[in-house]
Amino acid sequence: MTRDDALPDSHSAQTFYENYEPKEILGRGVSSVVRRCIHKPTCQEYAVKIIDITGGGSFSSEEVQELREATLKEVDILQKVSGHPNIIQLKDTYETNTFFFLVFDLMKRGELFDYLTEKVTLTEKETRKIMRALLEVICTLHKLNIVHRDLKPENILLDDNMNIKLTDFGFSCQLQPGEKLREVCGTPSYLAPEIIQCSMDDGHPGYGKEVDMWSTGVIMYTLLAGSPPFWHRKQMLMLRMIMDGKYQFGSPEWDDYSDTVKDLVSRFLVVQPQDRCSAEEALAHPFFQEYVVEEVRHFSPRGKFKVICLTVLASVKIYYQYRRVKPVTREIVIRDPYALRPLRRLIDAYAFRIYGHWVKKGQQQNRAALFENTPKAVLLSLAEEEDF
């Protein structure tokens, strides 16, 4: 067992060990490890986040105190939002001089990131379910003036029924009325333009809850396209793309999606925060609207006849389009296999199956490194403007 795998000694964490039996590691953070654990009285499975506030002994006393206060703030926010069906539930907490133990529900399906790596891209139907639940969570947070600041697929967990649970509130903050934030935190490819601007301009007024909506747009784009809208191997170029709001619904990956879903994504990815779509506004967008059951079932004779006529016309049109479809020849497949949707999905799926394991959590790693759909024209124009 390496030092990173070692557990806190039983003497300092006696109360925790009396109630829980820690098992294998599920994930790691900068100063924390997440393990599966068993609640001894009930044999129920949970996940415990073990936070070393000393950084393995490398932190100064000021850094230890800062991390301790940040952890207590995370616990406080989790308790304030307790009970929401799409937020991870904090079941128990333990504290020693050097460690925190935060016990959560165990989400066996893992992260949305891993599910996306397996599926490559999601359909509009799957995306609608996930994004509606995420936006409802954000509505709840923002009504309490809580900004998450680290929304990304790695921090969205899935239960056995594919329902989401938002987790990792380590960067979260509850704002006072009129308060603005200035500190730079989060994951680079999900940062809102105003966060980056704060790091470059001492006179910047700061940012607020709108940063979560930008990250939501990046998540939604990523679910549909398979890679984020802003990415470059040179991080400075990527940050420049974010600040300029330069992204595209490129072909062929966006050819099969509706204009409605593209419109919603574009309402999130607006550089000016005051013009960005809020969570409540997004939930009212046509992408999330459903037919009212009573209205659907109410047919008039005239309406029935109209539906029959339209169905016949559509069937005839589909039939003739099918008859006119050119056969896929060997030459077409050799020349541009990626232009054919079935082959495109097959190629992407096998690429992720072979290489997806190394595209994971590090800030220098990104899905786009493996599944690069970013239009080259955008990158070239940026490179010409400024040499990094």
Swiss-Prot record:
Pfam families: Pkinase. Its EC number is 2.7.11.19, 2.7.11.1, 2.7.11.26. ATP binds at L26, G27, R28, G29, V30, S31, S32, V33, V34, K49. Residues 343-367 are annotated as: Calmodulin-binding (domain-C). Disulfide bonds: none annotated. Residues 303-327 are annotated as: Calmodulin-binding (domain-N). GO terms for molecular function: ATP binding; calmodulin binding; enzyme binding; phosphorylase kinase activity; protein serine kinase activity. It is an enzyme of class 2 (transferase). InterPro entries: Kinase-like_dom_sf, Phosph_kin_gamma, Prot_kinase_dom, Protein_kinase_ATP_BS, Ser/Thr_kinase_AS. Residues 20-288 form the Protein kinase domain. Keywords: ATP-binding, Calmodulin-binding, Carbohydrate metabolism, Glycogen metabolism, Kinase, Muscle protein, Nucleotide-binding, Serine/threonine-protein kinase, Transferase. It comes from the Eukaryota. The active site is at D150. Belongs to the protein kinase superfamily. CAMK Ser/Thr protein kinase family. The two calmodulin-binding domains appear to act in concert to bind a single molecule of calmodulin and are pseudosubstrate/autoinhibitory domains. Hexadecamer of 4 heterotetramers, each composed of alpha, beta, gamma, and delta subunits. Alpha (PHKA1 or PHKA2) and beta (PHKB) are regulatory subunits, gamma (PHKG1 or PHKG2) is the catalytic subunit, and delta is calmodulin. This is Phosphorylase b kinase gamma catalytic chain, skeletal muscle/heart isoform. It comes from Mus musculus.
